[in-house]
Amino acid sequence: MSPPIPQTPPVNFALRRRVRNRSAAKHEQINFFCEEIAGRMFERLDYIKLEPRVILDLNCALGASSSKLAKRFPDALVIPCDPAFGLLRMHAAPKKLFSWFGKSLNRVCGEAHALPIAAKSVDLVWSNLFALSYDAPSIIRELKRVLKPGGLLMLSTLGPDTLKELRAAFSQVDSLSHIQPQVDMHDLGDMLAHEGFQTPVVDMEMVTLTYPDVKTLARDLRAAGASNLEATRRATKKKKNR
């Protein structure tokens, strides 16, 4: 009998969209980290022989990877996709953050667990810093659905040690969940294999960011749209004297 597939917490999708939309105007603040991880992903792509015709850039945010993918594969259709319309709208802002190399990219607003994309229509699903900390099995199943036979899934995500210092600090206050839990790489590999992905390769790198104070860290977390999205999290009201 196969071992049970690890489950991840249910998520408040409405809250997720609100948080990401709210972060759109400030998302450029954390581009340094997004571009660092994307650069490492593109280095790995150098070792893969692939000429995709259709590329889905999932959770594309401001579209930095979409731009680079369009340049790398000039004959491919690149589809930027994000659940936050506010971020997608930034692609067409008067002050463009990225060049689209003269190509018209079809932006799609949608959630990863229910993509508005036809089955077996995508050659490459790309996602940089994708939050797999919620509903991971159904999301991976959906990605398998949209991929063509022989298609490639390439993504980066955060690991369980993310914000471990902040989690330890909160544990001194109470026993509630303040930090969104992340998926272990071995569990992720099991989920991919369970959904029929062939020879999944999962590796890990430790990236350390140092902040001068908690206030600066909180600023970047808000800019990234990072929040505890568990549907079972405690609801709190902000008080003026808190």
Task: Enumerate the predicted regions with their spans.
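Class I SAM-dependent methyltransferase Rossmann-like catalytic core
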Residues: 2-50
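Class I SAM-dependent methyltransferase SAM/SAH-binding core
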Residues: 50-118, 124, 138-141
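Surface-exposed interaction regions that form or flank ligand-binding interfaces
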Residues: 88, 92, 232-242
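Residues lining the SAM
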Residues: 123, 127-131, 156
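A short His-aromatic
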Residues: 129-134, 146
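A short glycine-rich, Lys/Arg-flanked "PGG" loop and its adjoining helix->strand segment in the class I
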Residues: 137-152
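Conserved catalytic/acceptor-binding region of the Class I
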Residues: 154-216, 223-237
